[in-house]
Amino acid sequence: MTARRVLNPVQRVAIFGGTHGNELSGVFLVNHWLKHGEEIARPGIEVRPFITNPGAVEKCVRYVDTDLNRVFDSENLRNENNLNLSYEVKRAQYINSIFGPKGSEDAYDVILDLHNTTSHMGATLILEDSKDDFTIQMFNYIKTSMAPLACSVLLIEHPRLKYATTRSIAKHPIGVEVGPQPQGVLRADVLDKMRRIIKHALDFINYFNDGKEFLPCILEVFKVLDNVAYPRNANGDCTAIIHNNLQDQDWKELKPGDPMFLTLDGRMIAYEGDCIVYPTFINEAAYYEKNQAFTTTQKMTLCAQAIRCTEPK
């Protein structure tokens, strides 16, 4: 007999835009849905669009004091020293009070957090838990619905890299990352891909609540391995740029010996790892301040059990 998980119906969904204030697809879509909610309405489900970082949105910057998408850990969410808290930590506590508390039964069922990247990643879904059958099933549905358009899945489960994302307060946190799009700019093709992803995600939830059983599935994902830094000299100055052979090659294999960086005097720096990796977030503008040239991933397959709703509508 096929193993099956019987899960509670999804009652509350949030759609976050503006976690980074200069990633405009999510900002524009959420502001549109705040005025025209019929597009995202689904029977029996509360769907709430929400601008997470209005201070950054107003200034069209990534953040005001610190990255909102990295402060949703227990230390920041419980910090009561109001006089010294950054703007984003205060926002995190406020958001947690509305959509959380994180890790509790009162937290929202699903949060869809909308992001743009300057990297050539296309449509990307971000998974936080490799054992979350509900989200894996949703991603499989979205990928199938988006075909033939590619829709990659990035798994950010990692023993050392702790993300503490804005969406992590939900029972099922979902990142939506679409690019390439410059910061502070809107592109119609990028916005359309993001809009379609949200439609398919909400449709999946609606079908699930209606009693549709989703059979066991497998999902190809790219699991985060490490972040690769730019070469720097003793003074901390960047001494090389992304090699042209690597530029815009997100999700494609990088083999040992392949060109990785190019110095300004024309010297090629090769990838010296011991296995094939799949880079992503290549030359992401927002990560220059983090000295992060790209992220390496490994390709793997996840399996999800069949799921159905305990109390179909």
Swiss-Prot record:
Q: What does this protein do?
A: Catalyzes the deacetylation of N-acetylaspartic acid (NAA) to produce acetate and L-aspartate.
Which species is this record about?
A: Xenopus tropicalis (Western clawed frog)
Tell whether Cytoplasm is among the UniProt keywords: yes
> Single GO molecular-function term?
aspartoacylase activity
Q: Which PANTHER family match?
A: ASPARTOACYLASE (PTHR15162:SF9)
UniProt-annotated binding residues for Zn(2+) = 20, 23, 115
The subcellular localization recorded is: Cytoplasm; Nucleus
> Which residues of this protein are catalytic?
177
- Kindly state which keywords UniProt assigns to this record, in alphabetical order: Cytoplasm, Hydrolase, Metal-binding, Nucleus, Zinc
Gene giving rise to this polypeptide = aspa
Predominant cellular place of this UniProt entry's protein: cytoplasm
What is the reaction catalyzed?
A: an N-acyl-L-aspartate + H2O = a carboxylate + L-aspartate
Cofactor binding, note field: Binds 1 zinc ion per subunit.
Q: What is this protein called?
A: Aspartoacylase
- UniProt entry tagged with the keyword Transmembrane helix: no
The chain's coiled-coil residues are: none
